[in-house]
Curated annotation (Swiss-Prot):
Highest taxon above the source species: Eukaryota
Binding sites annotated in the UniProt record for heme: C470
Cell membrane listed as a keyword: no
Entries under Pfam families matching the protein: p450
Record-linked PANTHER family: CYTOCHROME P450 (PTHR24279:SF120)
Name used for this protein in its record: Probable cytochrome P450 12c1, mitochondrial
SUPFAM superfamilies reported for this sequence: Cytochrome P450
Cofactor: heme
Gene Ontology molecular function: any one: monooxygenase activity
PROSITE patterns: CYTOCHROME_P450
Similarity annotation: Belongs to the cytochrome P450 family.
Keywords: Heme, Iron, Membrane, Metal-binding, Mitochondrion, Monooxygenase, Oxidoreductase, Transit peptide
EC identifiers of the protein: 1.14.-.-
Length: 524
């Protein structure tokens, strides 16, 4: 299918598209024909503003429900598509549960796709009195300004050689994580405390910091970590905890500074101050090395960003920390749960990992990481069963018809794919953890078919799609692969408790059960 860039709606550009490309002409005509025969936007099913507001209050049907449960109710009440009206300055949003509409949205999103979900961050950055973020909203921005910033950071963060230089620093952080597990687990039961998610968060925070700030911060290594590192970590937690109340639930923060927004704003202020301090320290280190003639052919991500623009380096450090800690931690926790509950899969993974290492203390090389297909399959399957978020947000890049309804350009959309990932019609035995479904099959393989051959690729997009694909994907991949590989080569992992409803969904999925994993040292 063709990718269209529509500047002022489909009908405004149809003649231009037809002139340039006959295939584009037929596609535009198809969309125009759909539009003429579609139902008007005003007929979309959905609750009224009052029903929605009342539903989120005490005693309402949505009160205290996770976002995934709210969406289940929407789907049950209204079907595959519905309009959720905006409250208190929030834009109305079309929720769609149909993968065919996902593809149409992505294929017509335009040169600079508009993504929602970060309105509280944008609001804060626009309101700062010093206007630091003017013309530099970072990863949370939209439009031409976002396109300019993204074009600047893509060559830095998406190139393999830049990711490879973090192999050793991340392995060092991983060794600290393994040592930390041995310190905090119970000597008799070998189980870690129920708040083990905090330790995983420390791991991902330190891993991101090695890239974003070009340094370790000491949360895993030191019993009493530096206060500025602890404060930065706590403020990231406050930020993420505020997103649901500010970005999903009805909130007046756009008009008056609510208590939640005040807390959010203070956290953002302190994140900015701390990241600026660390970036300034990095500049001093770089200048000192340069004056001493200590040059390095492989400049760090932070050094490369500083060469582009200091402001961009600070903003990207903030955005990587805000976007790369909770998401990766949730992914790692899900992988561990799946491996703990499927010991035969864990053993197969361990055998693959050990086949690349000469000893327990050997370090992975870049070549090693390229030749671990089962490890990557384990991660893919886990992200299918336990996704990090419930879907992807966009604004319609053109006038389109979704499920028979006219959706005007600019309409906010939420493509909710998390339910589809567990649909047996799409993934046979969908509720089972089967990494093998992601491995290439030989032509003569007669084993069970574990993947629908007609599967639409737009169902499974854990890192997004197109120009707005996660800019840190390669770094996150490396982080997850190293963490899981190091854990299975050091420990046999068990989880001896119920995993019923293991995650709750607010803005992101988070563990809903105590992560009391049992880590038993392996003997070699």
């Amino acid at each position: 299918m063709l990718r269209l860039t529509v500047k002022h709606g489909l009908r405004a550009n149809s003649q231009l598209a037809a002139t340039r490309n006959p295939d584009a002409s037929s596609y535009v005509q198809q969309l125009e024909s759909e539009w003429e025969g579609a139902k008007p936007f005003t007929e979309l099913p959905g609750p009224t503003r009052w029903q929605l507001f009342r539903g989120f209050q005490k005693g309402g049907e949505y009160h205290q429900l996770g976002m995934d449960d709210v969406m289940r109710l929407y789907k049950k009440q209204f079907g595959d598509i519905c309009l959720i009206p905006g409250l208190f300055g929030m834009p109305s949003t079309v929720f769609t549960f149909n993968v065919e509409t996902f593809e149409k949205v992505y294929r017509t999103e335009g040169q600079w796709p508009v993504r929602g979900g970060a309105e509280p961050v944008i609001h804060y950055r626009n309101k700062r009195k010093d206007e630091f973020f003017k013309n530099c909203m970072g990863l949370f921005g939209n439009g031409a300004e976002w396109g300019k910033n993204r074009s600047a950071v893509n060559p830095v963060l998406m190139q393999h050689r830049n990711v490879a230089i973090y192999l050793k620093p991340m392995q060092r952080v991983n060794r600290q994580f393994v040592n930390r597990i041995r310190e905090i687990r119970d000597k008799e039961s070998q189980e870690v405390p129920g708040d083990f998610m905090n330790t995983i968060n420390h791991l991902t925070f330190e891993s991101v910091a090695t890239v974003a700030l070009d340094r370790e911060l000491g949360l895993l290594r030191e019993a009493n970590p530096p206060p500025e590192a602890s404060k930065l970590f706590k403020n990231i937690e406050v930020l993420m905890d505020s997103f649901f109340d500010l970005g999903v639930r009805p909130s007046l923060y756009r008009y008056i500074p609510t208590p939640t927004y005040k807390k959010f704003s203070r956290a953002m202020d302190e994140i900015f101050d701390t990241c600026s301090m660390y970036v300034n320290q990095a500049i001093e280190r770089i200048d000192r090395k340069s004056s001493q003639g200590d040059s390095n052919d492989h400049k760090s991500v932070l050094e490369q960003l500083l060469q582009i623009d200091r402001k961009l380096a600070v903003v990207m450090a903030m955005d990587m920390l805000m976007g790369g800690v909770d998401t990766t931690s949730t992914a790692i926790s899900g992988i561990l749960l799946n491996l703990a509950k499927n010991p035969e899969k864990q053993q197969r993974l361990r055998e693959e990992v050990l086949s690349k290492l000469t000893s327990l203390h050997s370090e992975f090389t870049v070549e090693d990481m390229k030749s671990l297909p089962y490890l990557r399959a384990v991660i893919k399957e886990s992200l299918r069963l336990y996704p990090v978020t419930f879907g992807n947000a966009r604004s319609a890049g053109a006038d389109v018809v979704l499920d028979g309804y006219r959706i005007p350009k600019g309409t906010k959309l939420l493509m909710t794919n998390s339910f589809l990932l567990k649909d047996d019609r799409l993934y046979p035995r969908a509720k089972e953890f089967i990494p093998e479904r992601w491995l290439r099959r030989k032509d003569d393989d007669k084993s069970d078919v574990l993947m629908n051959k007609d599967l639409n690729a737009f169902i499974y997009l854990p890192f997004g799609f197109g120009p707005r694909m996660c800019v840190g994907k390669r770094i996150v991949d490396l982080e997850m692969e190293l963490t899981v590989a190091n854990l299975v080569r050091n420990f046999h992992i068990e989880y001896n408790y119920s995993t019923e409803k293991p995650y709750k969904c607010r803005f992101l999925y988070k563990p809903n059960i105590p992560l009391k994993f049992k880590f038993t040292d392996l003997k070699y």
